[in-house]
Structures are given as C-alpha cells and as structure tokens.
From Swiss-Prot:
Function, as annotated: Participates in chromosomal partition during cell division. May act via the formation of a condensin-like complex containing Smc and ScpB that pull DNA away from mid-cell into both cell halves.
InterPro entries referenced in this protein's UniProt entry, alphabetically: ScpA, ScpA-like_C
Subcellular location: Cytoplasm
Alphabetical GO biological process terms: cell division; chromosome segregation; DNA replication
Record's GO cellular component terms: cytoplasm
Official protein name in the record: Segregation and condensation protein A
Record-stated family: Belongs to the ScpA family.
Subunit structure and binding partners: Component of a cohesin-like complex composed of ScpA, ScpB and the Smc homodimer, in which ScpA and ScpB bind to the head domain of Smc. The presence of the three proteins is required for the association of the complex with DNA.
Transmembrane parts of this sequence: none
Pfam families in UniProt: SMC_ScpA
Organism: Staphylococcus carnosus (strain TM300)
Gene this chain is encoded by: scpA
Length: 245
C-alpha cells in the first residue's frame, strides 16, 4: 500500500525529479519498475480525486511503461551487446537537462531577491548649473584633506551605530543634505565641517553629506578652507550662495 501526497509540480519531468530525489534514485541508473510504480500512484491518486490530468502526464506515463517493458525483455548474449542502446537514455538526458534548467532558474531567482534589497538612485540632472559662475578656488583646501575628514567622521560614527542595520526605503538625498548646509549658513557666515554631523548617522547619510558639500563647492555655493594641515575645515558662503533660492 502506498501513501501518496499531492504536491504542485511544473509538469511530468518535475514530478519525476521529485520522485528521484525523494527515493534517492541514481539518475544515471534509474530502476524503472520502482519509478514507474511511484509515478503511476500519483496519476491514479489524481484520477481518484477527479482532478483533471494534463495530457503531458499521460504521455510520460505511457513512455515509462514502454521503457519498463523493454527492460523486462530477455537480453541475448551477442558480440553487439555493448552497442545496444539503453531504453532509458533519452529519458535520462531530458531529466538532466530539466534539472540543470531548474537549478539555474533557482539561482537567477536568488540573484533577483538579493538585488531587490538594494535601492538605486537615478543620476541627478545638473545641466542647469553649467552656466552658473564658478569661483576662484586658489585658496581652497586640497581634496585629500576633505577626504581625510570624511574618513575621520566615518570612523567616529562607526562607534555609535549598531552593527546590524535595517534597510529602509526612505533615503537621505543630496538635496536634503545641501538644504541643511544652506540653513546653517543662513544663521552663521561660517560653520565647522564637523558641526554638520551628530556622529550617529549611517554610512549613506555621511556619504550623501560629503557628495553634497563637493557639489556645492564645485558650483560656488559654498567655499571650503583650512588654516593649516589637520586643522578644522571651515565652510563659508560662496559667490553663488543664495542664487536661485
């Protein structure tokens, strides 16, 4: 007596692979009697429950019975025995091909799920800024100093943030960071670079602030200066500060 559990399968080959894995059958040496019996049990169970059976399942059932019958025929000892075609060969080839296809599909689905954990931002159109007058940067600090300051902020922030971070769809934009800098400069003509941070920001917010400062500096909205190496970095209003506000 057999216990049959009806699962959802994507066609007869999917059902055969399920049975092969369930009963730990060697796909290269399939015992046709056992596999055919299990397959037919599934077909009979569907009929008993009055479930419509797709014609492709019945076609494969006929094929299994034919292969089983051929394997039961007596084998005559001849010099050509080694060249006799195994009646299972075509079925095995199709099963292996389907198995490879299924594994590759699962792999692609995993990649898709991983990609869905990331959120992309489309490039910002800055073409309207091309005509804005740029300012003389002869007294600006070296970009290396600004990058070093960014690294110090990131290092200090890492001690105040949890190791596990929940991904949220709400992102901190360059426009928001630029607005914060502009609002601080509206109150004071000069602000300290490090005053922009609470050191509780996540990496995304730090990077966004950094990119906003670079963009504002490039377009002359702010000016960045440093009295000497490793000293505080000061941000002041640039020649284009307030234009278009």
């Amino acid at each position: 007596m057999y216990e049959v559990k009806l699962d959802a399968f994507n066609g007869p080959l999917d059902l055969l692979l399920h049975l092969i894995h369930k009963y730990e059958i060697d796909i290269y040496d399939i015992p046709m009697k056992a596999l055919t019996e299990q397959y037919m049990n599934y077909i009979h169970a569907m009929k008993k429950l009055e479930i419509n059976i797709a014609s492709e399942y019945l076609v494969v059932a006929s094929e299994l019975l034919m292969i089983k019958s051929k394997m039961l025929l007596p084998q005559h000892d001849t010099e050509m025995d080694d060249e006799i075609e195994d009646p299972r060969e075509d079925l095995v080839g199709r099963l292996i091909e389907y198995q490879n296809y299924k594994e590759y599909t699962e792999f692609l689905n995993e990649l898709k799920e991983q990609r869905e954990q990331f959120y992309s931002k489309h490039p910002t159109d800055l073409s309207h800024l091309e005509s804005i007058e740029t300012w003389d940067d002869s007294q600006t600090i070296d970009l290396t100093e600004l990058i070093m300051a960014y690294q110090r902020i990131k290092t200090r922030t890492s001690f105040n943030t949890p190791k596990s971070v929940t991904i949220q769809k709400e992102t901190f934009t360059i426009e928001q960071a630029s607005k914060q800098v502009t609002e601080k400069l509206a109150v004071s003509n000069s602000i300290n670079f490090f005053s922009l941070f609470t050191f509780k920001e996540n990496t995304e917010e730090i990077v966004t602030h950094f990119l906003a400062i670079l963009e504002m500096s490039k377009t002359g909205i702010i000016q960045i200066n440093q009295v000497k190496d490793f000293a505080d970095i000061n941000i002041t209003r640039g020649v284009n500060y307030g234009i278009g506000a």
